[in-house]
């Protein structure tokens, strides 16, 4: 399954706020699906499916990518759900978004693809690159790159930067300070339901 390229508002009306996908907020009105199921018990499968879809659309990844992340998380020590979220949050495109250097994760992915971003002074053009503690995220020393990201920071760095990240506005430099904790996730999600959804596939 490829990445979703349709209307983003339609997605957030169904799944709720997804800041990684769009900075728009859903209108509080019932969709036809909600109206038709208001008097019916929603199946457990559907609940798990919607939680899975939240992760997919928020982080802008394909079904195959998400399944691979679940498999990696299952083989790691610790809570599978929390490790899954850590893997997604430590993607380079998400780090750029959480630092306020891009308005959305798709916007951050575009910056990476166009080679505007350096990690530890080396250009990285892979959005899924897994960042680690003590990685420095900087902007390519080019006027166009600097202008794009400076404008983004001015408009979009209004949300509190999570504790595992640090941004130096003078140097225009981000730092991955540590592995994030569960409280720093920028999405309302029940990751255990996602793990349960993939229980027979991972």
Swiss-Prot record:
Annotated PROSITE patterns: RIBOSOMAL_S4, S4
Cellular compartments annotated: Plastid, Chloroplast
CDD domains the UniProt entry points to: S4
SUPFAM superfamilies: Alpha-L RNA-binding motif (SSF55174)
Pfam families found in the cross-reference section: Ribosomal_S4, S4
Gene3D superfamilies named among the record's database cross-references: Ribosomal Protein S4 Delta 41, Chain A, domain 1, RNA-binding S4 domain
Domain of life: Eukaryota
Key words, A-Z: Chloroplast, Plastid, Ribonucleoprotein, Ribosomal protein, RNA-binding, rRNA-binding
Annotated TM spans: none
Main localisation: plastid
Keyword Chloroplast carried by entry: yes
GO cellular component: chloroplast; small ribosomal subunit
GO biological process: ribosomal small subunit biogenesis; translation
Subunit comment: Part of the 30S ribosomal subunit. Contacts protein S5. The interaction surface between S4 and S5 is involved in control of translational fidelity.
UniProt record similarity statement: Belongs to the universal ribosomal protein uS4 family.
Function per UniProt: One of the primary rRNA binding proteins, it binds directly to 16S rRNA where it nucleates assembly of the body of the 30S subunit.
Alphabetized HAMAP family for the sequence: Ribosomal_uS4_B (MF_01306_B)
Protein name: Small ribosomal subunit protein uS4c
Organism: Splachnum sphaericum
């Amino acid at each position: 399954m490829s990445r979703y390229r349709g209307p983003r508002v339609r997605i957030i009306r169904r799944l709720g706020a997804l800041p990684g996908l769009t900075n728009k907020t859903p209108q509080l009105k019932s969709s036809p699906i909600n109206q038709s199921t208001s008097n019916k018990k929603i199946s457990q499968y559907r609940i798990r499916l919607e939680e899975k879809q939240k992760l997919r659309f928020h982080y802008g990844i394909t079904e195959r990518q998400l399944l691979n992340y679940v498999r990696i998380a299952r083989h790691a020590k610790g809570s599978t759900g929390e490790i899954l979220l850590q893997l997604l949050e430590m993607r380079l495109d998400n780090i750029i978004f959480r630092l306020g250097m891009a308005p959305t994760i798709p916007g951050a992915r575009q910056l990476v693809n166009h080679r505007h971003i350096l990690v530890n002074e080396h250009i990285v053009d892979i959005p899924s690159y897994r960042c680690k503690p003590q990685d420095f995220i900087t902007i390519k020393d080019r006027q166009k790159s600097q202008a794009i990201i400076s404008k983004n920071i001015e408009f979009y760095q209004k949300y509190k930067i999570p504790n595992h990240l640090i941004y130096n506005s003078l140097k225009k430099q981000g730092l991955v300070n540590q592995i994030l904790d569960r409280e720093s996730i920028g999405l309302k999600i029940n990751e255990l339901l996602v793990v349960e959804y993939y229980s027979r596939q991972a």
